[in-house]
Amino acid sequence: MNNWHLRFGITANCNFRCSYCNSNNCHSTDMSDDDIKEILEAAMNNGVKRIHWTGGEPLFKRNICDFMKYAKMLGYEEQSMTTNGFFLADKAEDLRDSGLSRINISLDTMDKNKFKEIVGVDALDNVLNGINKMLKTTDCLIKINMVVMKDNIDEITKFIDFAIDNNKKYGKERIIVRFLQFFPCNPNQLEDKGKKFWVNEYITESDILNRLKCYGEIEEINRKKIQGDNPSMRYYRINDNITIGILAMFSWKYPCGGCHKLRISPQGNVTVCLNDKEVNKIVGLSLEEKTSLISRLIDKREKVIAKNKDRKHFRSNLGEFRFGKTGKEANIDDFYDMLRKGKGKDCNF
């Protein structure tokens, strides 16, 4: 199978207002149905056979399942999605029938009050009901993504126990919990209020690993054994009961040499790197032009990977691709300096 996969941000709209996100300031113009279908065709013309639907909130897109069925008809062999889980209870069967093979669900707390505080909506029960519906009605692998912050790090064991209980009930490896470091990816984190929030809530990889010691031996495993291999993720086994993942790009200084993601933004831009200075408009082009543009970008990225497989790359213009809004200029050392000033000069990253 082609190493490349299409990461398709199909809408910038979202019904949550997470404290670490920038959804209020997103440029939210959606692509036309014809452009979406032609992008799917153009990627397929370049040998891409995997797709990951994102947003915004992809299930906020009314006809998302129609596009998934179209992708299935074109020959996409694997379809996955990242969602906040709010609509899952109502959409589980449709997603299953549209070709979904696995799903990432963003969930940062099991506490109802804290959930409302983090996402701005009283909807924890909706998300948990959605997870339960997916477990009962589909065979999808479920990856729960928890953004770990100072405010919720004490819940790490709750998430692991939740996965252990459900894996016993529905089958081994139905749920994988992934702990995501709160790292700078948002223009708001360059403003005074956002900067203070990030510095205060930032958690290191070591902090996460220390919370796992109560489960005994932690064994790192080959990430390629995990369905939906992500080169940025490290996976571990805990007592042979559960697989967990850790994404700590900030602690690792942004390794990106193995990335094969063709990214489409909700604003109709295409790139092969979130931190690339070259962001191309793909909407409005003919199918032939879309196919040619994707071919050129993939070829460019392959040459970069061939030259430097251990490449590390962090670009300063936060949010330009994710949110359609560019932040101030800054580099990774600026963020390390923020942490030193906020937490002490000897702080770990």
Task: Specify the residue positions occupied by each region the protein language model found.
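Radical SAM/AdoMet-radical enzyme domain recognition
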Residues: 33-53, 57, 61-180
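Conserved beta-strand segments that form the floor/walls of ligand-binding pockets within enzyme
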Residues: 5, 9, 22, 52, ...
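A short acidic, helix-capping loop that chelates divalent metal ions and anchors anionic groups
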Residues: 26, 111-118, 186-191
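Canonical Radical SAM [4Fe-4S] cluster-binding loop centered on the CxxxCxxC motif
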Residues: 1-34, 273
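Residue-level recognition of short loop/turn positions
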Residues: 17, 55, 267-268
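Accessory C-terminal segments flanking Radical SAM cores
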Residues: 184-322
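Residue-level signature of catalytic and energy-coupling elements of molecular machines
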Residues: 10, 177, 268
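N-terminal [4Fe-4S]-dependent radical SAM core
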Residues: 1-7, 17-19, 45, 233-245, ...
